[in-house]
UniProtKB/Swiss-Prot annotation:
Cofactor: [4Fe-4S] cluster
Classification of source organism: Bacteria, Pseudomonadati, Thermodesulfobacteriota, Desulfobulbia, Desulfobulbales
Protein name: Ribosomal protein uS12 methylthiotransferase RimO
Name of the encoding gene: rimO
Ranges for domain MTTase N-terminal: 1-116
Entry's Gene Ontology molecular function annotations: 4 iron, 4 sulfur cluster binding; aspartic acid methylthiotransferase activity; metal ion binding; protein methylthiotransferase activity
General function of this protein: Catalyzes the methylthiolation of an aspartic acid residue of ribosomal protein uS12.
Annotated organism of origin: Desulfotalea psychrophila (strain LSv54 / DSM 12343)
Catalytic activity: L-aspartate(89)-[ribosomal protein uS12]-hydrogen + (sulfur carrier)-SH + AH2 + 2 S-adenosyl-L-methionine = 3-methylsulfanyl-L-aspartate(89)-[ribosomal protein uS12]-hydrogen + (sulfur carrier)-H + 5'-deoxyadenosine + L-methionine + A + S-adenosyl-L-homocysteine + 2 H(+)
CDD domains: Radical_SAM
Matching Pfam families: Radical_SAM, TRAM_2, UPF0004
Record has Hydrolase as a keyword: no
GO process annotations (BP): tRNA modification
């Protein structure tokens, strides 16, 4: 039997999709294109309305295929099911099976029954799955880099966010289990692991006082040889002081942090139910650069939050002009059904939200152009990704200061190297987000 899988949403969702791939592979299924497949699956995102709309469009595209080939089966998985199961069941009768976020590890059993015509519920909603190293998983990223999801769920209660109600409470994997998975990845040739969670700094909060992110990192440093360890999605917290010290002392933890701060105005942050203020953010950025002057910092901002004034919005631009963060994403606020902020007064007009978003992105583009110039004339370690997406005449890769999929890249215009190598590159030019350089040496 053959299947086709579409994966939507974030890296954490992609790990779930890789579990689906691994489970179906082990059950004897073969992956193919949507026309040749007996089974059509889509792992959905339901975090924000644009993601919901994208997921529905993908499902309807599969429904169109099934209209021409009614023998095909459609399975919808993930966050959209978790959030809107009743509405989906009513509005999409063409879908044969709906599976919530916690059902990915049992997908082979569910689709086996579906294909065999055995009786089972049309909507399957298991509770509180936790990834382990023993769960089958087929890596879909290039062989030299992988995502490692160290928690499920979230205990933070941001007023605009539905993740806790979709993904459930925080559940942390054991240190030994994460270590086992990373050791297997290194043995298969992985050069870079990116630790991911809704909030990495919350790792271990449910496991007792002796387990936290620092403990995990020290074990990974001591018991694996992975060259690059990247940390994505952290909260400003008390843990960060010690984390910065550990990063500064261990070059295998790349000098890069992704901390989605969302805003800098104290009143807006309070309304968002974020547990820090502008002074905390400024202190963290200054501390990070005191420990590691070359650290790259990424963040995201949410503009147009209910009640946000033009003056409060302008504080973000002031913050960026002074602190000059390396990588910035900006998103317009959208009301999410069931989130507390849905009912907040003084909702901001969509046109104003889009304008604020565009202006902030334009500012960051100007700042980024200047920030990138500091790399020109330096030699940087670059993880080679392969032939450039822009032209077959160039190779491309990333420095430790660039995360996959979201940041810029290094275009390699001189020298012969292969994907998966970490090489020394002399940076000769910079662009708005990208760098250009040639090979100096290969590790």
């Amino acid at each position: 039997m053959k299947f086709h899988l579409i994966s939507l949403g974030c890296a954490k969702n992609l790990v779930d999709s890789e579990v689906v791939l691994g489970c179906l592979r082990d059950a004897g299924w073969e992956m193919t294109d949507e026309q040749d497949a007996d089974l059509l699956l889509v792992n959905t995102c339901g975090f924000i309305q644009p993601a919901v709309e994208e997921a529905v469009e993908e499902i309807l595209a599969l429904v169109d295929i099934k209209a021409d080939f009614p023998e095909k089966k459609i399975v919808v998985l993930g966050c959209l099911v978790q959030r809107y199961k009743e509405q989906l069941l009513e509005s999409l009768p063409e879908v044969d099976l709906f599976v919530g976020t916690e059902g990915v590890a049992n997908i082979a059993e569910y689709v086996g029954k579906l294909i065999a015509g055995e009786e089972q519920d049309k909507v399957i909603m298991p509770t509180e799955f936790l990834m382990t190293a023993k769960v089958p998983r087929q890596q879909s990223t290039p062989f030299f880099r992988a995502w490692v999801k160290i928690t499920e769920g979230c205990d933070n209660r941001c007023s605009y966010c539905m993740i806790p109600s979709i993904r459930g409470p925080l559940r942390s994997r054991s240190v030994a289990d994460v270590l086992e998975e990373v050791q297997a990845m290194v043995a298969s040739g992985v050069q870079e692991i990116s630790l991911i969670a809704q909030d990495l700094t919350a790792y271990g909060d449910d496991l007792g006082d002796d387990v936290n992110l620092l403990v995990l990192l020290k074990e990974l440093l001591a018991k694996t040889s992975v060259p690059w360890i990247r940390l994505l999605y952290l909260y400003p917290s008390e843990l960060l002081d010690e984390l910065l010290q550990l990063m500064a002392a261990n070059p295998r933890i790349v000098k890069y942090l992704d901390i989605p701060i969302q805003h800098v105005n104290d009143r807006v942050l309070h309304l968002m139910n974020r547990p820090y203020g502008r002074a905390d953010l400024e202190e963290f950025v200054d501390k990070a650069r005191a420990h590691m002057p070359d650290i790259a910092l990424r963040t995201t901002f949410l503009v147009g939050f209910p009640g946000e004034t033009e003056e409060e919005y302008a504080e973000i631009g002031e913050f960026l002009r002074v602190r000059k963060l390396d990588h910035v994403g900006v998103f317009p606020y959208s009301n999410e059904e069931g989130a507390p902020s849905e009912h907040f007064p003084d909702q901001v007009d969509d046109e104003i939200k889009e304008s604020r978003c565009a202006r902030l992105l334009e500012l960051q583009q100007e700042l980024s152009t200047e920030i990138q110039k500091k790399y020109v004339g330096t030699v940087q370690k670059v993880l080679v990704e392969g032939v450039s997406e822009e032209t077959d005449l160039l190779l491309e890769g990333r420095t430790q200061y660039q995360a996959a999929d979201v940041d810029g890249r290094v275009y390699i215009n001189e020298g012969q190297v292969v994907a998966g190598e970490i090489v020394d590159i002399l940076i000769t030019d910079s662009q708005q987000y990208d760098l250009v350089g040639g090979v100096v040496s290969v590790e």
